[in-house]
């Protein structure tokens, strides 16, 4: 009886294996899918940028790391496309990541520091050739979208959060 049990159990155990799902090839282009920014957990440095191909259902759960070889950072808060570029605002890392909107190739990491103090950028809006970024240090930083350099700082009060541009005016909401 013991031999029969072994003859049944041994082949069953060795025939079991985990199936590895075939990766679904994904065509990465803004016209064929969605980009999703996941904020990540506070102070865990695990924000991600995912890609969902709406035609095939293919998903890339960390497109940013695939394209750059590094983590996006801590607390991704805003994502906008403007002028052929994608801008990702990462608050606690105090960076703005700029990528090509077609290929998602990295173009520049803009460090948002005042000396060595983190500005903690929050939101971004665009007008003309400028990007406007709220920073928790009480300013809106103006970035030239060609050079990708900060060209001006505008004082706006405590903890600016959102911003909106209409009729040649910049509106900023403060939370402090």
Predicted segments, located by residue:
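Predominantly soluble domains enriched in secretory-pathway, periplasmic, or organellar proteins
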Residues: 17-176
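Sec-dependent signal peptide recognition
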Residues: 1-7
């Amino acid at each position: 009886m013991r031999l029969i049990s072994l003859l049944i159990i041994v082949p069953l155990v060795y025939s079991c294996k985990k199936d590895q799902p075939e990766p679904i090839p994904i065509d990465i282009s803004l016209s064929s899918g969605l980009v999703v920014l996941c904020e990540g957990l506070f102070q865990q440095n695990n924000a991600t940028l995912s890609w969902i191909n709406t035609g095939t259902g293919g998903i890339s759960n960390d497109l940013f790391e695939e394209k750059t070889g590094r983590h996006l950072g801590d607390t991704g808060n805003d994502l906008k496309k403007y002028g052929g570029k994608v801008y990702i605002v990462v608050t606690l890392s105090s960076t703005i990541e700029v990528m090509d909107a077609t290929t998602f190739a990295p173009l520049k990491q803009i460090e948002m520091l005042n000396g060595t103090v983190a500005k903690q950028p929050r939101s971004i809006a665009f007008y003309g050739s400028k990007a406007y970024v709220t920073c928790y240090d009480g300013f809106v930083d103006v970035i030239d979208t060609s050079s990708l350099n900060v060209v001006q700082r505008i004082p706006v009060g405590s903890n600016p959060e959102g911003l909106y541009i209409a009729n040649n005016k910049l509106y900023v909401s403060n939370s402090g």
